[in-house]
Amino acid sequence: MSDVTAAQRVKLARAVSRPGAMDYINALFTDLFVCKGDRLHREDPCVFGAIARFHGKPVTVIGTRKGRTFEEKMKYNFGMPSPEGYRKAQRLMRQAEKFKRPIITFVDTPGAYQGLEAEAEGQGQAIAASLALMSSLSVPVIAVVIGEAGSGGALALAVGNRVILLENA
């Protein structure tokens, strides 16, 4: 596939047929205990977070969801997390640090939501706080880029000891 153009690779990264975060999470992890909300404002369904088991070991798993149908895309804001989503992820990361659980993230986002409401609710600060927190964690962090990884919105969930990019991501 060395003759694939950059534009074709972008199309491949955005393909609806690509496995999403939940496909990987449901295939790899057991005993999921889903965590919702940022404890400040509201739940962002775009960012999924759970405590789970990977080969019997407890881990924290975080992923961005885009959806496949129009209804799902609307529900998940087309894969663009809000400040609440980043704060939920931070809450889970702090909890993972406290209980010494490794963190695994699955990133597929065109970037953070850019709406006026998101900016008013502290989108830039939420992204910066995620970057700072992830870079200071003592637990192992594996970040897997499974599709798009646009701008700081993706970086906020992709700082890790190991960063894995899937082909055409």
Language model regions located:
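Terminal-region recognition feature
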Residues: 1-155, 159-164, 168-169
